Curated annotation (Swiss-Prot):
Catalytic component of the RNA exosome complex which has 3'->5' exoribonuclease activity and participates in a multitude of cellular RNA processing and degradation events. In the nucleus, the RNA exosome complex is involved in proper maturation of stable RNA species such as rRNA, snRNA and snoRNA, in the elimination of RNA processing by-products and non-coding 'pervasive' transcripts, such as antisense RNA species and promoter-upstream transcripts (PROMPTs), and of mRNAs with processing defects, thereby limiting or excluding their export to the cytoplasm. PANTHER family: EXOSOME COMPONENT 10, POLYMYOSITIS/SCLERODERMA AUTOANTIGEN-RELATED. Pfam families: DNA_pol_A_exo1 (PF01612), HRDC (PF00570), PMC2NT (PF08066). Mg(2+) 1 binds at D313, D371. It comes from Homo sapiens (Human). GO terms for cellular component: cytoplasm; cytoplasmic exosome (RNase complex); cytosol; euchromatin; exosome (RNase complex); membrane; nuclear exosome (RNase complex); nucleolar exosome (RNase complex). This is Exosome complex component 10. GO terms for biological process: CUT catabolic process; DNA repair; exonucleolytic trimming to generate mature 3'-end of 5.8S rRNA from tricistronic rRNA transcript (SSU-rRNA, 5.8S rRNA, LSU-rRNA); histone mRNA catabolic process; maturation of 5.8S rRNA; negative regulation of telomere maintenance via telomerase; nuclear mRNA surveillance; nuclear polyadenylation-dependent antisense transcript catabolic process. Residues 289-455 form the 3'-5' exonuclease domain. There is a cross-link at K19, K583, K710, K826, K833, K859, K873 (Glycyl lysine isopeptide (Lys-Gly) (interchain with G-Cter in SUMO2)). Residues 831-848, 861-871 have a biased composition (Polar residues). The gene is EXOSC10. Its EC number is 3.1.13.-.
């Protein structure tokens, strides 16, 4: 057993400090330290005693032979198992370790012991982390309408039930309030949930270096006077239609209004110098103002314009609204805290654009990725010159980047995050929620100073890291809010995330339910999670219930809008059930890999069951590439025409876009102007040059040479052009074209020869057929032969031969006989001493004194025997007459 951790006494002593002086933590011990010391001594003594026991082997077997030692071991073993069983039972583990067999279940006992140790040590680690503050005990946050299960209270457990009721009543917090009047009803401008792109709400641009586009500055004033026909449509849709009518540039409409200012923004030199951290004022001494009127908002804006920096944070609610609502805005300066009721001042918040877009004032945010989009969506507010402490924490490589960690690290303040998911639409706000919102910005300016100082010290007096943080914060300020747009394929994105396979009916139901949920959420201004959560929608699509009660059975708890419109949903399910039941992988574009069919295996020569190089990763089959390869078409959910078999039309074979072995032809150049991608590909192809081309002028991208330098004798170009004449470009082109033309003629001649050989082979008659035809012709001649006719035929043949023109005979040459009197007859003698010829004579015998008698006999015997076959027919039938020795 390992000794306890060194931080355990510190934690237990801290817990003992909360107890009263007269109360003991454990019986017999005044505090936790004394108990830890006693337990540690006992553990050390037990460890030493266990080391003195006989070791397993011959020594243990010898002692085991004595009955007294055997009885002692069994007694102590039972005591240990009983203690272990109690400890395991206390921690909720399986505690039947003592009741098992001693021989057959030894491994099971060991497994139980290992599992129990893991559970106990994990629980000890969690409790130590909670005591040291690393991991706080998070209280559950549940909706207000959720009914907590109640225990049946009787006379025997009434006290326990009352105690549990008191303890559990403090653990639940509100996620959303049930009986709140919707703040959307009080807004002066109706919320735009239409399925159109988001248009910026800004119509006045303070601190502008580039004026606001005319399409945005005049849109609010044009609608009531100049466009009365658009009064019955949503404002955003009316603006969008008007822009399409007047053909105004969409780039100006949807561009970031402060993009020019942000691109040309540079932080001041003062914020890049070494800072002097200014300690925050105690929260009890800092005044806090709740802004809920227009006059107070204007006064706040004037105060902010006189500050050098201020901190900003937002509280957002997204459960009971389609696009979400910004319910609260907190602003803190060095001396004051402000909380703005943005639900009440929603239409007047544009006033703060004057201070938020001032490039001379630093705005400090923490995790502003969502805050920037919320400010644009609800108020038309934009931020210039922002410092994001979240990006600074990432650059400093801190352990965690949350605001809770920064408060604990720099300010030693423990923040309570139990109201993070609270319903911020509640009015009036409780004091606890106001205090939570105020803490988010009260300490942020001091954290901003401390982080700047730390980055300055890490940069060795150089503001490199500070500039990186401002650059990242500027990129966040350039973000734009994008409204969710519904399309016919929107459901596929959610369907692919679920990793479930649906057939055609289920997929159709999923598509119809997704469209119904989107339409209902936009109309009722509710979120997707409130109308119909994703898991419930997928469950209904999988089950396809036949009755409305089945739809309700798939939802627990049942959303209110589902219960109200259950009949409409039932009609959608019936419509989906009428679809033909087919596989949905091809329709939905979900690729599913599988083995090749048997027909493809037979046709494909290169197929191997374990050869992965020929199997594409997306599961499409491979077909032989001898013919033309089909091209994959664009997938569609409901095709108008019935497509052919997938195996024959959707073969994906990768082909090189750029290759070294293709020369650009004249036909490709005549097709038309090249796109940007084609030009890039052409440039890459031109870069693949033959290494021997370096001595020839390049065909393209020539270096600019002045014409005067070519005719100036003092220049190097003139000298090179006169001394070394290189091949001209046109000559190279002509040679290439000649080679191509010759190759084309050769291929055409080869093809023609192949066709001629093929035709001759088809018309050729085999040898057997020729013999049969000759025999048949001979039989016919014999049958029809007559002596008179034969004589006539012979005479005709003689006449034909005589009529043939004879070739002219060559002139006769004069014959001169050879004079043998002048010849040397000694050359024919065997032993004559004539001149030795320089040429080798194979028939010439070498003179030798001793002659080999055996070789002579062998030659005579071989010469006397005949190796020929006898002529005539044999009397022994079909047997051959082989020569005998």
């Amino acid at each position: 057993m390992a000794p306890p951790s060194t931080r355990e006494p510190r934690v237990l002593s801290a817990t003992s400090a909360t107890k009263s002086d007269g109360e003991m933590v454990l019986p017999g011990f005044p505090d936790a330290d004394s108990f830890v010391k006693f337990a540690l001594g006992s553990v050390v003594a037990v460890t030493k005693a266990s080391g003195g026991l006989p070791q397993f082997g011959d020594e243990y077997d010898f002692y085991r032979s004595f009955p007294g030692f055997q009885a002692f071991c069994e007694t102590q073993g039972d005591r240990l198992l009983q203690c272990m069983s109690r400890v395991m039972q206390y921690h909720g583990c399986r505690s039947n370790i003592k009741d098992r067999s001693k021989v057959t279940e030894l491994e099971d006992k060991f497994d139980l012991l290992v599992d129990a140790n893991d559970v106990i040590l994990e629980r000890v680690g969690i409790l130590l982390d909670e005591a040291s503050g690393v991991n706080k005990n998070q209280q559950p946050v549940l909706p207000a309408g959720l009914q907590v299960p109640k225990t049946v209270v009787s006379s025997w457990n009434r006290k326990a039930a009352e105690y549990g009721k008191k303890a559990k009543s403090e653990t639940f917090r509100l996620l959303h309030a049930k009986n709140i009047i919707r703040p959307q009803l009080k807004f002066r401008e109706k919320i735009d949930n239409s399925n159109t792109p988001f248009l910026p709400k800004i119509f006045i641009k303070p601190n502008a270096q580039k004026p606001l586009p005319q399409a945005l500055s005049k849109e609010r004033r044009e609608r009531p006077q100049d466009r009365p026909e658009d009064l019955d449509v949503p404002p955003a849709l009316a603006d969008f239609i008007h822009q399409q009518r007047t053909q105004q540039v969409e780039q100006d409409m949807f561009a970031h209004p402060y993009q020019y200012e942000l691109n040309h923004f540079t932080p001041a030199d003062a914020v890049l110098q070494k800072p002097q951290p200014q300690l925050y004022r105690p929260i009890e001494e800092t005044p806090c103002h709740f802004i809920s009127s227009l006059d107070e908002l204007v006064e706040l804006n004037e105060k902010l314009l006189n500050c050098q920096e201020f901190a900003v944070d937002l509280e957002h609610h997204s459960y009971r609204s389609f696009l979400g609502l910004t319910c609260l805005m907190q602003i803190s300066t060095r001396t004051e805290d402000f909380i703005i009721d943005t639900l009440e001042l929603r239409s007047d918040m544009y006033i703060l654009n004057e201070s938020l877009t001032d490039p001379a004032i630093v705005k400090v945010f923490h995790g502003a990725d969502s805050d920037i989009e919320w400010l644009q969506k609800d108020f038309g507010l934009y931020v210039v010159n922002m410092f994001d402490t979240h990006q600074a924490a990432r650059l400093l490589n801190l352990g965690r980047h949350s605001l809770d960690h920064l408060l604990k690290l720099y300010c030693n303040v423990d923040s309570n995050k139990q109201y993070q998911l609270a319903d911020w639409r509640i009015r009036p706000l409780p004091e606890e929620m106001l205090s939570y919102a105020r803490d988010d910005t009260h300490y942020l300016l001091y954290i901003y100073d401390k982080m700047r100082l730390e980055m300055w010290e890490r940069g060795n007096g150089q503001p490199v890291q500070l500039q990186v943080v401002w650059q990242r914060s500027r990129d966040i300020c350039l973000k734009k809010f994008i409204k969710p747009i519904f399309t016919d394929e929107s459901y596929l994105e959610l369907y692919r995330k679920q990793k479930k396979h649906l057939n055609t009916q289920q997929l159709t139901a999923f598509q119809l339910l997704f469209a119904w949920r989107d339409k209902t959420a936009r109309r009722e201004d509710e979120s997707y999670g409130y109308v119909l959560p994703n898991h419930m929608m997928l469950k209904i699509a999988e089950e396809l219930p036949k009755e409305p009660q089945g739809i309700i059975a798939c939802c627990n708890p049942v959303p209110p809008l589902v219960r109200q419109q259950i009949n409409e949903m039932h009609l959608l399910i019936q419509q989906a059930r009428e679809m033909p039941l087919l596989k949905s992988e091809v329709a939905a574009g979900v690729k599913k890999s599988g083995p090749l069919p048997s027909a493809e295996r037979l046709e494909n020569v290169l197929f191997g069951p374990h050869d992965c190089s020929h199997a594409p990763p997306d599961g499409y089959p491979i077909i032989p590439t001898s013919g033309s390869v089909p091209v994959q078409k664009q997938a569609s959910l409901f095709p108008d025409e019935k497509e052919d078999n997938l195996l024959g039309t959707t073969c994906l074979i990768a082909t090189a876009v750029i290759t070294l072995f293709n020369e650009p032809s004249a036909e490709d150049s005549k097709k038309g102007p090249l796109t940007v991608a084609q030009k890039k590909a052409q440039n890459i192809m031109e870069s693949f040059e033959n290494p021997f081309r370096m001595f020839l002028p390049s065909l393209g991208h020539r270096a600019p040479v002045s014409q005067a330098a070519k005719f100036d004798p003092s220049t190097k170009i003139y000298e090179i052009s006169n001394r070394w004449k290189l091949a001209q470009v046109q000559v190279q082109k002509d040679s290439k074209e000649a080679v191509k033309k010759k190759a084309a003629e050769q291929t055409a001649a080869r093809e023609q020869a192949k066709e001629a050989c093929k035709a001759a082979a088809e018309q050729a008659i085999s040898v057997r057929q020729q013999v049969v035809l000759e025999n048949a012709a001979k039989k016919r001649e014999r049958a029809t032969s007559d002596p008179r006719t034969t004589e006539q035929k012979q005479e005709k043949k003689r006449l034909k031969i005589s009529k043939k023109p004879k070739d002219p005979e060559p002139p006769e040459k004069e014959f001169t006989p050879y004079d043998y009197s002048q010849s040397d007859f000694k050359a024919f003698a065997g032993n004559s001493k004539s001149k030795v010829s320089s040429q080798f004579d194979p028939n010439k015998q070498t003179p030798s004194g001793k002659k080999c008698i055996a070789a002579k006999k062998i030659k005579q015997s071989v010469g006397n025997k005949s190796m020929s076959f006898p002529t005539g027919k044999s009397d022994r039938g079909f047997r051959y007459n082989w020569p005998q020795r």
